[in-house]
Regions:
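Cys/His-rich short segments
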Residues: 114-171, 175
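Short, glycine/charge-rich beta-strand/loop segments that flank catalytic centers
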Residues: 91-102, 120-133, 191-192
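Structured secondary-structure scaffolds
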Residues: 1-47, 99-103, 150-220
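N-terminal Rossmann-like or analogous alpha/beta NTP/dinucleotide-binding catalytic cores
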Residues: 1-118
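Short, glycine- and charge-enriched coil/turn segments that flank and shape catalytic ligand pockets
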Residues: 1-2, 63, 138-147, 180-182
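Short, solvent-exposed loop/turn and secondary-structure capping segments
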Residues: 20, 57, 137-139, 217
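Short, charged low-complexity intrinsically disordered segments located at boundaries
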Residues: 105-115, 135-143, 201-211
Length: 220
């Protein structure tokens, strides 16, 4: 049986130049990739840039540039970083590439066909910088402004029509998988934390946005 090993860095958000944190994450992933190759694994080591979202759109406008041009310039700096650090990555993915668009559209259509995506309305506290929604118990007030209690980032109340991924339907399947594959969650010290989180019930996930245009269009 082939021994395959896949590892990825976070695909970095190019709203600014690379910094020490990006270098740290990349080097850690590179160490794992090199070690697994020595052990005889077929390694696929990925890194890249996540180039869509409201934050990118706003930063591009702030710099008076088209979002794609803005991303082209900054993504190159992240790609150059892989050479400066002598990383052994096998691929560098950009979410603005046609191959990524094609993969997203294919996955979306499969999920629609299987009934795992549905259209509904969403309302909640949204952080542009975190690109995440927060529940009301995850919000606090500071100096008269609402912020995320988790990240400290400002949040705004948002209401919009959205497609949702039916994550709630996968709770039992995930719990069974964790039980049958005891080494799946590493380090093992985190296993109870993950299991307890899933046992509480997973919420369906909003997977589309109408509040900005810089993203992959929802397939028709």
């Amino acid at each position: 049986m082939d021994k395959n090993f896949y590892i990825t860095t976070p695909i970095y958000y190019p709203s600014g130049k690379p910094h020490m944190g990006h270098a740290y994450s990349s080097i850690v992933a590179d160490i794992f990739a090199r070690f697994k190759r020595v052990e005889g694994y077929n390694v696929l080591f990925l890194t890249g840039t996540d180039e869509h979202g409201l934050k990118i759109q706003r930063e591009a406008k702030k710099n008076k540039k088209d979002p794609k041009i803005f991303c082209d310039e900054l993504s190159k700096k992240f790609k150059d970083l892989t050479k400066i650090l002598n990383l052994s990555n096998d691929d560098f993915i950009r979410t603005t590439e046609p191959r990524h668009y094609k993969s997203v559209e294919e996955l979306w259509n499969r999920l629609v066909k299987s009934g795992d995506i549905y259209l509904d309305k969403y309302s909640g506290w949204y952080s542009v910088s975190d690109e995440a929604y927060y529940d009301k118990d995850e919000i606090k007030e500071l100096d008269g402004k609402k912020i995320s209690a988790i990240s400290g980032s400002p949040v705004d109340w948002v209401e919009e029509e959205s497609y949702f991924f039916r994550l709630s339907a996968w709770s039992e399947k995930l719990l069974k998988y964790y039980k049958d594959n005891k080494d799946f969650i590493l380090p093992s010290s985190r296993k109870n934390e993950v299991v307890n989180f899933v046992e509480k019930g997973l919420k369906d996930l909003s997977v589309s946005r109408t509040s900005f245009s810089w993203g992959i269009p929802v397939p028709k």
